[in-house]
Regions:
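Two-component/phosphorelay signaling modules centered on CheY-like receiver
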Residues: 2, 16-36
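Acidic catalytic/metal-coordinating carboxylates
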Residues: 37-38, 69-75
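Acidic, metal-coordinating helix/loop segments flanking the phosphotransfer/catalytic sites
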Residues: 35-58
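His-Asp phosphorelay/catalytic-motif detector in bacterial-type signaling
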Residues: 54-57, 81-87
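C-terminal output helix
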Residues: 96-98, 112-126
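The feature encodes the CheY-like receiver
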Residues: 19, 66, 75, 92, ...
Length: 130
């Protein structure tokens, strides 16, 4: 089955079960995805590429992770001006909602509170890639 778009949805979450579930969901909706277990791995694997080499994309980013947090990665991306080219959708637990709202005010595309609706998340991804 061919992907519906040539864009890539990057998933950065330190929980292997979440990464696996999101990869399955995206595959079932014919969306290309790449999963990373840490912000550091994502930064080394994707953000080191020149922007002209990268595919159109969006980023599903866990707010809290071991090592570099999703918030720290977002702040680094803001400093480098990478948010406009790669919309960020934060995945957050209930306690992080005020922080997630603040990130949207600062340039994140949106946030989804865990547990999230598959359809709502896919709709947000489609909007981010439009």
């Amino acid at each position: 089955m061919e992907p519906v778009t040539d864009a890539t949805v990057y998933v950065v979450d330190d929980d292997a079960d979440v990464r696996e579930a999101l990869a399955w969901l995206l595959r079932s909706r014919r969306l290309l995805s790449e999963c990373y277990r840490s912000a550091e791995d994502f930064e080394a694997g994707v953000l080191k590429l020149p922007p002209v080499v990268r595919r159109p994309s969006c980023l599903l980013l866990d707010m809290r992770m071991t090592g570099m947090s999703g918030l720290s990665l977002f702040n680094r991306m803001l400093e480098r001006g990478e948010i406009a080219a790669m919309p960020v959708i934060f995945l957050t637990g209930h306690a992080d909602v005020p922080t997630a709202v603040d990130t949207v005010k600062r340039g994140a595309f949106d946030f989804c509170e865990k547990p999230f609706s598959d359809n709502a998340l896919v709709d947000r991804i489609a909007q981010a890639l439009a």
